[in-house]
């Protein structure tokens, strides 16, 4: 695990290097847990592996582990790598996911910085993200991130993103197809949020 990195969320107004800010922000997200449950459930059901499969998951911009924890609960033999740029968020996530100790680790790096993917080892059955990538706020950079993600997905695996339409979902899905993903579509749509992504064919 890396010990020092620039925050992957440095492209917006959040203060992810502040323990107090991170704790207050996470507490503000807790009431939204029920709202995102439907999206998380669809995302989990879309991962093309049996529940008892010993899959490896990568959560991009994992934050305090809301999605990671949901998936580790749904896939009891899975392990996860939580990528995030905030050391304070990683500390909070490690505390909140204590019951999954030994099944996850944090890697601190900035997915908006070139070469971020080289900080990760191996490939993943599922690469996922939740309300994170839109924070980059640079369409060309988001397109490049999707190209970086593709080699991280193992044959037969998937990339699934629960995020806002910034940039528009149609543009993002076109970038996923250009990166090599197949069967790209929106799997769930809510108010100003959707689960979309694609698969890496065997």
Please provide the spans of the model-predicted regions.
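Class I SAM-dependent methyltransferase SAM/SAH-binding core
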Residues: 56-58, 64-114
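A short SAM/SAH-binding and catalytic strip from SAM-dependent methyltransferases
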Residues: 125-140
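Core SAM-dependent methyltransferase catalytic element
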Residues: 185-202
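Conserved class I S-adenosyl-L-methionine
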Residues: 2-50
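A short glycine-rich, Lys/Arg-flanked "PGG" loop and its adjoining helix->strand segment in the class I
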Residues: 143-155
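Short alpha-helix
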Residues: 167-179
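Conserved beta-strand signature within the Rossmann-like core of class I S-adenosyl-L-methionine
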Residues: 156-163
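A short acidic, Gly/Pro-enriched loop at the edge of an enzyme's catalytic core
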Residues: 117-127
């Amino acid at each position: 695990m890396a010990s020092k990195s620039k925050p992957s969320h440095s492209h917006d107004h959040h203060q992810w290097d502040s323990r107090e800010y991170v704790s207050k922000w996470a507490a503000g997200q807790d009431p939204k847990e029920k709202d995102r449950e439907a999206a998380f459930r669809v995302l989990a059901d879309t991962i093309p592996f049996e529940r008892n499969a010993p899959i490896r998951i990568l959560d991009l911009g994992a934050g305090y582990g809301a999605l990671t924890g949901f998936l580790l609960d749904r896939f009891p033999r899975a392990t996860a790598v939580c990528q995030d740029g905030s050391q304070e968020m990683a500390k909070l996530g490690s505390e909140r996911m204590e019951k999954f100790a030994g099944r996850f680790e944090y890697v601190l790096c900035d997915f908006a910085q070139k070469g971020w993917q080289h900080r990760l080892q191996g490939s993943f059955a599922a690469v996922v993200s939740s309300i994170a990538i839109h924070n980059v706020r640079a369409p060309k950079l988001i397109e490049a991130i999707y190209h970086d993600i593709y080699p991280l997905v193992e044959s037969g695996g998937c990339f699934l993103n629960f995020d806002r339409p910034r940039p528009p979902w149609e543009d993002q899905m076109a970038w996923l197809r250009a990166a090599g993903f197949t069967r790209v579509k929106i799997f769930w749509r809510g108010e100003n949020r959707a689960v979309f992504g694609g698969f890496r064919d065997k």
